[in-house]
Amino acid sequence: MHCDIYKFLKHDDMYIYIARPDYPNDTDEIKDWLGVLPKDFRAGLGRSKFVMHLDLATTPTLARVDKEEVLAKLASQGYFVQLPPQDVMRRQAELRARESQDSIYNT
């Protein structure tokens, strides 16, 4: 299974894997690969940036995620969302809360 990996400027350390089951036979036309994502979810992601193309058949392991879980999600829904580790998510939430409080009290 081939896939493309994207990151999003609004979401540090979150990556989305998009299935490319017909690769390399799907490269002749321009396609919106992110179109497999639910519209509401995609709208909240912001601008995407292509990170890399990956052949999961020749990749022994993946960083921070289970390869079999990725393959199962790609096969069933066409994408896989790799969230940041819990400590990173907690720090980001704390920072957003602090910024929100600062904006309330500094106006």
From Swiss-Prot:
<feature type="domain" description="YcgL">
    <location>
        <begin position="1"/>
        <end position="95"/>
    </location>
</feature>
<dbReference type="Pfam" id="PF05166">
    <property type="entry name" value="YcgL"/>
</dbReference>
<protein>
    <recommendedName>
        <fullName>YcgL domain-containing protein Pcryo_0807</fullName>
    </recommendedName>
</protein>
<dbReference type="InterPro" id="IPR027354">
    <property type="entry name" value="YcgL_dom"/>
</dbReference>
<dbReference type="InterPro" id="IPR038068">
    <property type="entry name" value="YcgL-like_sf"/>
</dbReference>
